[in-house]
Amino acid sequence: MAYRDQSLGELAIAIPRATKLFRELNLDFCCGGKQTLSRAAGKKDLNIDELEAQLEKLAAQPSDARDWREAPLADIIAYIIPRFHDRHREQLPELILMAEKVERVHHDKADCPHGLANQLTAIYNELSQHMMKEERILFPMIGQGMGANAAAPISVMEHEHDDAGRDVEVVKELTHGVVPPEGACNTWRALYSGINEFITDLMEHIHLENNLLFPRALRGE
């Protein structure tokens, strides 16, 4: 099957295991989910034929993941809030505390991620406001069947998703790709492991909203 002309977002929805492959190849399927596979692969100098073959194998594998394409929008929202919103509220404060400790204890080391705690704090503050607006304004509109009239708030949320994506790139730069240095202490390793988990969750979160919930809501489903 030819996948090259489909968008990354469409492929991530149709082939749930594709998200892991896209993350490994640094293909942005959440904020950049509207670009075609061919275009995204071209930007990264990836072999499109090999990439299509990999997706073909993934598509043939059985998956236990729920297919959200036909699920009621209220069910998607009911999944997003505890799985992602509440999880981010738990993750970030702990990551900030660990980042502060690592910066304090290892401030004199060359690989110390100076500024990481401040960057994570900024992400936490911005994401908290963002999620609150979704929960108080946008999600109730969608739940009441008013999604077709929600173009303005959806546009704002998508722009804030883009901002979150850029903030995550700063985190990656500060942490050398979120890879702990050789000999890093347990806290340092736990911090980077937690950041990687947060980034994975955030990408899945944005993907589900940008590529599935919002388009379906705008269509008046």
Swiss-Prot record:
Gene Ontology molecular functions: metal ion binding
A single GO BP: response to nitrosative stress
Keywords: Cytoplasm, Iron, Metal-binding, Stress response
Disulfide-linked positions: none
Cellular compartment(s): Cytoplasm
InterPro entries: FeS-repair_YftE, Hemerythrin-like, RIC_family
KW Metal-binding (keyword) present: yes
Gene Ontology CC, one term: cytoplasm
Major location (coarse): cytoplasm
Job of this protein: Di-iron-containing protein involved in the repair of iron-sulfur clusters damaged by oxidative and nitrosative stress conditions.
HAMAP family to which the protein is assigned, alphabetical: RIC_YtfE (MF_01606)
Subunit comment: Homodimer.
Family label: Belongs to the RIC family. YtfE subfamily.
Protein's recorded name: Iron-sulfur cluster repair protein YtfE
Organism: Pectobacterium carotovorum subsp. carotovorum (strain PC1)
